[in-house]
Amino acid sequence: PRATTTAHVDTLSIEDKLKYAIINGEKSVGEGAQKKPLEELLEDALAQYTPLDLINTVLLDGMKTVGDLFGARKMQLPSVLDSAGVMKSAVAYLEPKMEKQSGSQKGTIVLATVKGDVHDIGKNLVDIILSNNGFKVVNLGIKQPGDSIIRAAQEHRAHAIGLSGLLVKSTLEMKYVIQDLERQKLEFPVICGGAALTRKYVEDDLRREYTNGVFYADDAFAGLHIMEDLATENGARDSRLREGRTVKEYAKAAVVDEETGPVFAERSPVVGDVPNLPTPPFWGVRVRKDYDLREVFRYINETALFKNQWQLKTASQTDYLRLVEEKFRPILHKLEDEVTESGLFAPAVVYGYFPAQSDGNDVIVYGVPSGESRVPSDNSRELLRFTFPRQREGRRLAISDFFAPKSSGKMDVIGLSLVTIGHQASVETQRLFEAGEYTKYLYLHGLSVETAEALAEIHHKTMREELGISAEDSPEIRDLFHQKYRGSRYSFGYPACPNLEDQTKLFALLKPEENVGVRLTSTFLLEPEQSTSAIVVHHPAAKYFVV
């Protein structure tokens, strides 16, 4: 329990029993014969309160305690979602008994993941927290253009607009929405959140674009606190708006203009030639759908799952390890059993090997040898080129350095891969969200994303084995998360391989839509979200680096 112990719960007042239910995420309260379901407790309370008063005074007070416990790191996000689930059930029970009246909610926010971004977990968590703290949430979904967001804010007379996005590109889309609001002289305060955002970008750059308030929310409860001020009609709103209009001067980093100065194309001096280039077991493309899900689960990065996806936050590493051992690893194993038995995850891989050479900052990909030939010829047909950025100082690396230069006369090999666990995971997580099964939604979404990453990890190991370079693999799976193996895999959208549009080239070669059912969106993202693609490089010097 997270509140009063069960030994004393039977002696509590009806108000405290309801708060206990919310804080502890339990839909029945009491011991033995005294145990009562939530609906009975609500009926008892209705003898003293109107439904609206019960929500606003007792139930929301319970949710406030939940927020305080979360802020103090005394409650984990999954437990917060348990509480939100109880709150949702209580409100759903009371709503038919309420007179329809305006003003029964604290205020309205229009929420959206911006144009081009398919990620919705962060936005949906904000929806859960705000809607179960008395706010009306108009959740527009993913990939929302600015005009749709603004139109919805006008239609619903929103107190604020909430913009969410995971990608670096999404931060620019947020700026475009804010510029549109300014151009139209509209006055909706805007709350921004997402993994690629920084406080500096919001409070400095974005506030320069808009005169009516822009706020940075690093989690759902930060968004709640901002909304609570914006939805009031007193000094708190004015004070909060003044804050949102005040540009905060941050120290400016030195800016390099990418368009000026020479483009260096000379191979880095720290990258040597590979004396014996590996030969792949086949040229061209293959599809694999025979990975054992149990084996894939062994390659899940638990730190990424527990800390990033499930958002475990503790006061100390000791507390974290105890929580993982006592609560969260058992939950993980139970969920793995469920998805294995149900067939919800369907691991599938399309990958291939192609002859390749470097030409300055380019990697040239050639057609595969025809007939029985295992060796690409010197007059192989060029299919396409990937162009990579180069570091301007230091080691001056580019991914192209890790391939044999065209001038060497040697033909190298490039690996390409795309992995997915299929569409059903997305369908089921959306169903759980809409059904109010918030905690299971968080758990399943996190597991689905990390299972796709685990599939990428285990398949990269398979490719190293096929290329004959796996002898350098660490025997410890956790070491593989830190590149304790020969070579590297680079995914589009990351610093050394930033151009998302290059996904179209990978798609031209691997044909993932027809082979494994993964499509490319208009902004070059993979759908379903639980998919990832990569360029696979065998060179011993190839590791992650920042350009």
Task: List each language-model region with its residue ranges.
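Active-site loops and adjacent core secondary-structure elements that bind or stabilize anionic groups
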Residues: P1-N56, D61-G67, F221-L442, G446, ...
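Gly-rich Lys/Arg/Thr-decorated short loops/hinges at beta-loop-alpha junctions or inter-strand turns
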Residues: D10-E15, G67-M75, S104-V110, L125-K136, ...
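Conserved helix-loop functional segments at active or binding sites
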Residues: D44, T65-A72, S89-K100, N132-L140, ...
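C-terminal amphipathic alpha-helical interaction region
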Residues: Y49-V58, A72-D120, V449-E450, A454, ...
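Short acidic, glycine/serine/threonine-rich loops at helix termini
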Residues: I121-V126, I149-R151, L172-M174, K200-L206, ...
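Cofactor-cradling patches in redox/metallo enzymes
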Residues: V126-I129, N133, N139-R208
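Phosphate/diphosphate-binding loops
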Residues: L167-C192, A196-L197, D204-D205, N212, ...
